[in-house]
Amino acid sequence: MSLNHHFRRLAALVGVLLGVSVLLGACSKPTGAGGSQPVILNVGATAEPTGLDPATTTGAGTPFVLLYNVYETLVRINDQGEIKPLLAKSWTVSPDATVYTFDLEPSATFASGSPVDAQAVVDSLLRIRDGKDTTQVLRSQMEKVKEVTAVDEHQVRVTLTGPSQQWLYDMTSTAGIIYDLGAATDLSTTPAGSGPYVFSSHDVGSSVTLKRNENYWGTGPRVDEVNFRYYADANAMVTAMLSGQLDIVSNLTVPQAVDQFSDAARFKVLEGTTDGEVVLGFNHVNPALQDVRVRQAINHAIDRQAIIDGAWGGKGTLIGSMVPPTDRWYEDLSRTYPHDPEKARALLAEAGHAEGLTLRLRVPNLPYAPPIARLVAAQLREVGIEVVTEELEFATWLESVYKQRDYDMTVVAHVEPWDLAAFARSDYYWGYDNPEFTELMAAADATTTEAEHTATLKKAAKVLADDAAADWLFLLPNIIITTTEVSGIAANGTGLSFDLTHVATSR
């Protein structure tokens, strides 16, 4: 989760991965934006923004729509998980890895016409670090920032309290957004950024509309208007795609339906990877779940391949940790706790629960979570754990589970990049506190070489897996369906944004 961040895409993926789709129904001429007829892109999505100010809003729905489209960052992440320039054309790092100097794009402007200058960058970064309404996750990502200084109009220097491998990566996402704070607007209702699109409207419960930024400082977008339309039923999106109402399903959240798009004359199917770890999360405040034997029992009780097959059409990757294969410190830890119901029963008896145990499993009503919850509940009952399941509206889940921590177990996809660090925060909604793991994460962040960073994070991931801090069920695939006219969509979902920068249609 960062969840804020953390729902750093939940989907955006499902949820962040959250099943999404793009409808190009009303597109006319292939001349693109600026032609005689407007090019309109309609995007069907399952995760609606719970707010429009990324600094104060949790959930993946907000960055899914706004990040890189309306708001830009100094640096961005590409579909291969690499950090690339955006508002900063280049940057340097001091030998001790504590001072970052960013050289800004001199031509960059906000949609209002104001320059994206050094002072705008300073004000935006300090807003995240010092803002009283900034989400907890974003504040934690800026904790290491000691000072932000405008060296001159187009250069910014950021001084950290110590070396941090994580910090620059965090700057590719919500924590690194540069806001037009001088705009005469309330950012909670009217986003104001420098991206290729401008915010137009939000019809709560229905849609968000973006329009082409006619004064964009970079290469302009190839569509004139984007309508993100929200579906509570992922199958309804499939039906809409098949009937010609949609032109893109930008993360198929009913993978069983992929065979319905086999007509190569009409559809293209892209299959990539994501950062979306589907986690059976534990509330470590619960006395029973504080016992590692109970957590290990749950891990042994779960048949993860059966969950992939039964809930996700056989699509997905077993991982066994909070590290996706696209991270350089990935190791396959999926056999740490093999499916072994007898071992699970023995561990429960050893922990004093031979007569059984009852736990609440509260999940968001995102496409992947309820079917997974039903399978998890059935498998746990086989070893003597009675599971009381409850499906919640996503906004309710964020308030009750994520903020108030009113749950025993939950299922959610954490889709933000480099999110292993979330387990090092005892104030996070899991309430996990393992000094050995926390020390390893701090040591990894303070390394100054890639090799040291990788080796230390591998150790940390292994400690986390051995401690059964959660049950990492599987990694979500990124399954995208488009019409044959659509181009410019990356197969991998490695960030929180549904990036429209290069999307086009030949229709």
Identify the function of each model-found stretch.
Residues 313, 317-350, 368-371:
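Structural transition elements
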Residues 185, 213-259, 386:
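Ligand-site clamp/hinge motif
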Residues 386-397, 421-485, 507:
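Extracytoplasmic/peripheral linker and loop segments enriched in polar/acidic and small residues
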Residues 480-507:
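Long beta-strand-rich cores associated with HINT superfamily self-processing modules
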